[in-house]
């Protein structure tokens, strides 16, 4: 037989005439995690425990009020209240919307500090004093 003799209609039928079916069902991992939930400045600390790949758990921060600020001169950490977000190199819009990400400059009770942790991944805000 010649290959040109076969009529190939839509992609819903096989050359034998049988129906084409779904190869596999949609897996949860293929759907993705949805839009990013970036931690915001809030009235108090809000954390969420989520199941992640491999059945592990991850503590994510949704809202933050306090940060662990490292004071280089005294070589110690201080739990300080976050007053505001000064700037965010990752995205200038984040500072206006009060999003806290790694690298953001925050104003605390003890002075300005740079966030060194990833709050959305670690569930805690660690920062180093720059003033």
From Swiss-Prot:
InterPro entries, sorted: Ribosomal_eS8, Ribosomal_eS8_CS, Ribosomal_protein_eS8_arc, Ribosomal_Se8/biogenesis_NSA2
Residues passing through the membrane, by range: none
Superkingdom field: Archaea
A single Gene Ontology CC term: ribonucleoprotein complex
Protein's organism: Pyrobaculum neutrophilum (strain DSM 2338 / JCM 9278 / NBRC 100436 / V24Sta)
UniProt protein name: Small ribosomal subunit protein eS8
Entry keyword annotation includes Ribosomal protein: yes
One of the protein's GO biological processes: translation
């Amino acid at each position: 037989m010649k290959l040109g003799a076969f009529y190939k209609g839509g992609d819903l039928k096989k050359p034998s005439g049988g129906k084409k079916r779904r190869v596999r069902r949609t897996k949860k991992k293929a759907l993705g995690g949805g839009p990013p939930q970036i931690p915001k400045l809030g009235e108090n600390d809000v954390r969420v425990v989520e199941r992640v790949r491999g059945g592990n758990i991850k503590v994510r921060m949704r809202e933050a009020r306090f940060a662990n600020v490292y004071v280089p001169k005294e070589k110690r950490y201080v739990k300080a209240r976050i007053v505001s977000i000064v700037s965010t190199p990752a995205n200038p819009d984040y500072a206006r919307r009060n999003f806290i990400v790694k690298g953001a400059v925050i104003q605390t009770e003890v002075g300005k500090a740079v966030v060194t942790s990833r709050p959305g991944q670690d569930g805690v805000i660690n920062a180093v004093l720059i003033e």
